[in-house]
Amino acid sequence: MLLENRPVWDDHEWSPLPALDGDVHTGTCVVGLGGSGLTAIQELLARGEPVVGIDAEDVAAGAAGRNGGFLLAGAYDFYHDAVRLHGRARARAIYDATIDEIQRIADATPDTVRAVGSLRIAATEAEVSDCREQLSSMRGDGLQCDWYDGEHGTGLFMPADASFNPLARCRTLATRVLSDGARLFARTPVLALRQGMVESSFGTIHCDRVIVAVDGKLDMLLPELRGRVRTARLQMLATAPTSERTVPCPTYYREGYEYWQQLPDGSLTIGGFRDRAGASEWTFDTTPTDAVQQMLESFVRDRLGVSAPVTHRWAASAAFSTTGLPILGRVRDGVWAIGAYSGTGNVIGALCGRAVVALALDGNTLPAELLVGNVQC
């Protein structure tokens, strides 16, 4: 593979943020400048709270800017499974909150969002039956969900879902919070963090509280979360624009292990096959591998019927929780954490960003409890 490990979303028009240079003082230090961290920073600024945000690389350099660009309602588990695992009240509350959040994202960054819905396509007869169970459960609760049987396969159409450019959205948010008074620093990896202090090689941030808003490698940064959180490598590729196939909306297949969409310019982007590569994909390494990339390309050629050349190959780290619900709560004295979105951080992560601010500043547990149940405040 000779292609650079760069996502299709990157238009090369971003000027990297500076690194921290010396000690600074602030009210809250947010570690992680992805979608959830930037949402937390927005919320802090709205409350008049001084804030410094840092990232080991740059804005949305991790999964926040390197994912498939899906805005999906609901929890990690399909709705009927979420009802079984977490109870109907929580499953419904999460679904309603994510529907509202998708609209909020569209209103805040309309140039990055396309309200086109999404398709869940079954790979087996067993999955067709599972789709029918999901349809029954959702319709029984008055949620939008339509049966689909057409050109792209058999499954479900979700009208409330959307497509977006995740990197463009995060860069827009970063630009806004900078203009609103936040201080943001890139290339500033954390060496140590504790109550009142975040240390890096370039200086120390003295603060009243720390919010860790990291998804992939959360278990590396906060080792106490190991056993509840595990980081995986998610790989993707994109093709040149093509008219060989028209994909009307974000589509996920084989219970979500494969996922693809067609961008406005006609290019096709696809990710998946993490499970087929076995234990090797439970790793902190974000280098694309020949094995998974070959499976992705074969799927594009054989299943989707697209022969357009591959233009991008990339990977990112994403953390998965043992419950399917995110990490959200106090993890050390003066330190709160959000992350481990299990591949669904585009929407859930934004909700967690606001919920953790309410938790850390006010001790208000209600927004967090809606998402994860009992929390440590």
Question: What are these model-predicted stretches?
Answer:
Residues 68-71, 75-76, 80, 116-121, ...:
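Central beta-strand plus flanking loop segment that forms part of the substrate or channel wall
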